[in-house]
């Protein structure tokens, strides 16, 4: 696990707030099962270290290791699956103030495990919080992308769009990643000539640091504010007939 740089440690020591009441779920959507090393895990380590240095409770999940069935229902064993670990995984994500999804790039796209995670999150999108809003309101999300082909921004675009559609709040610059040279070659953290590749890449370290801190800042703001104000966005109130000043569409 890479250590934080002096600059990153200095930022942690001068934090403008406390974050030790926050929880973060870092979900690695690598296609590799444990104990195979994951390049995506290596970059997620940087985010995890920044969070932990600020007292955040960090829960690491390698999605590939869990027997999560594909589908868009809360429990796919009720829809034909032989087994489904999602009912055990879901509370770990639901209770986190911060969700960071890590994915490799394959054929210019996020991994199939990442797509499955997003679909399972979508299956929970009808859940409501105590204010009658969708369950993901008041939570923040970001993503980490690795690979040795272009596609960081394309993958980040899809992941972050999906998260905001579900109700997550996305801070500025909520994606970061590393890609190597085009074609087969070393990936993030691979050792070449005695040195790990990409660890000292300033662009990657800067963007990863900015993402981690923007997630912390926004999670702090939303938590202190009690979440997103509950007006004009409550599914329970809409279903009860409230239209929040929406004009009557009938012709008069």
Which residue ranges define each predicted feature?
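Short, glycine-/small-residue-rich phosphate/pyrophosphate-handling segment
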Residues: 38, 130-185, 203-206
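N-terminal beta1-alpha1-beta2 submodule of the flavodoxin-like/Rossmannoid cofactor-binding fold
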Residues: 1-131, 194, 198-252
């Amino acid at each position: 696990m890479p250590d934080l740089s002096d600059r990153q440690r200095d930022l942690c020591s001068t934090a403008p707030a406390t974050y030790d009441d926050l929880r973060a779920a870092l979900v690695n959507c690598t296609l590799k099962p444990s104990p195979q090393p994951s390049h995506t895990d290596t970059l997620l380590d940087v985010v995890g270290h920044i969070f932990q240095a600020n007292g955040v409770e960090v829960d690491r999940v390698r999605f590939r290791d869990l027997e999560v069935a594909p589908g868009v229902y809360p429990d796919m064993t009720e829809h034909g699956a032989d087994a489904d670990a999602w009912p055990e995984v879901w509370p770990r994500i639901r209770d986190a103030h911060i969700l960071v999804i890590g994915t490799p790039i394959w054929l210019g796209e996020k991994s199939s495990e990442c797509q499955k995670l997003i679909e399972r999150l979508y299956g929970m999108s009808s859940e409501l919080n105590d204010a009658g809003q969708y369950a993901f309101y008041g939570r923040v999300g970001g993503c980490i992308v690795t690979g040795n082909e272009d596609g960081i921004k394309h993958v980040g675009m899809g992941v972050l769009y999906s998260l905001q559609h579900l109700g997550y709040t996305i801070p500025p610059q909520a994606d970061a990643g590393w890609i190597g040279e085009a074609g087969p070659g070393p990936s993030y953290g691979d050792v070449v000539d005695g040195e790990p590749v990409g660890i000292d890449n300033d662009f990657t370290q800067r963007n990863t640091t900015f993402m981690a801190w923007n997630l912390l800042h926004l999670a702090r703001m939303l938590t202190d504010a009690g979440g997103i104000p509950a007006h004009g966005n409550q599914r329970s109130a809409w279903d009860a007939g409230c239209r929040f000043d929406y004009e009557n569409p009938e012709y008069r």
